[in-house]
Amino acid sequence: MERRKKQNEGLLSVYPPPPWYSRYFTDENVAKVKDLQSSDNSQLLEAPLKYLTPPSPPEAGAYHNFGDVWQVNDKLATLEDLGITQVYDGAAIRGEGQESGARVLELKKLTKSLLLAFVELTGIMGVSPEQFPAKFEHVRVLLINIHHILNEYRPHQARESLVTLMQQQINDKKQHVENIRQSCDKVRDTIRVLSKQFDQVDEFEETGGVTTEEVKYVSGKDKDLLVVKMAEQVL
């Protein structure tokens, strides 16, 4: 009993200690597991070697994780399953109500009821404090009902969040494609300009102007002037 209590305290701590079966993870056992896995030996299921292989994922029921119980098929429990009184009209927000404003209307009603209950609670505390537990329980039930309706929106919120994320990724990819297209256009324009300049150089040399061969035989200041002259005629 004492051992189980310590294990539960460890599971609920911020940094839980290593599980009790961690002592079986020795070099010798790890080597045995590798040999058995390679030979498909059924002795692998025997203790303590079975603790060295991860269990198969659960397909149904519940599982424990850090001291809490989680359902494999996660679904929102009803207020009746939780033992909470349902104060809103459940039939109005199901079926056709999912597409209408029934949920919003019920939330507004519950919010107004919560404000009224809080005002009554503050008044009771000054006049009749012994009625505090009943009124406080009423406030608690109203809050749980509000949260339950909001939690029913979670699947819709998840779908819309996924749609928004995917749309953002599509927009980013389109923007990247557009940036690449603009860069390609700039490269084409640059190549076109350079091609025209080379054509002008060829035409310049064919007409008997100052050529690069003539520049080789000129030195000093005269050479600089000839280069400037060539650049001006090309541009």
Curated annotation (Swiss-Prot):
Gene3D superfamilies: 6.10.140.1520, 6.10.140.200. Its main location: nucleus. It is found in: Nucleus. GO terms for biological process: negative regulation of transcription by RNA polymerase II; positive regulation of transcription elongation by RNA polymerase II; positive regulation of transcription initiation by RNA polymerase II; regulation of transcription by RNA polymerase II; RNA polymerase II preinitiation complex assembly. The keyword Transcription regulation applies. InterPro entries: Med7/Med21-like, Mediatior_Med7, Mediatior_Med7_sf. Keywords: Activator, Nucleus, Transcription, Transcription regulation. The keyword Transcription regulation applies. GO terms for molecular function: transcription coactivator activity. GO terms for cellular component: core mediator complex; mediator complex. It comes from the Eukaryota. Component of the Mediator complex, a coactivator involved in the regulated transcription of nearly all RNA polymerase II-dependent genes. Mediator functions as a bridge to convey information from gene-specific regulatory proteins to the basal RNA polymerase II transcription machinery. Mediator is recruited to promoters by direct interactions with regulatory proteins and serves as a scaffold for the assembly of a functional preinitiation complex with RNA polymerase II and the general transcription factors. Belongs to the Mediator complex subunit 7 family. Component of the Mediator complex. This is Mediator of RNA polymerase II transcription subunit 7. It comes from Yarrowia lipolytica (strain CLIB 122 / E 150) (Yeast). The lineage of its organism: Eukaryota, Fungi, Dikarya, Ascomycota, Saccharomycotina.
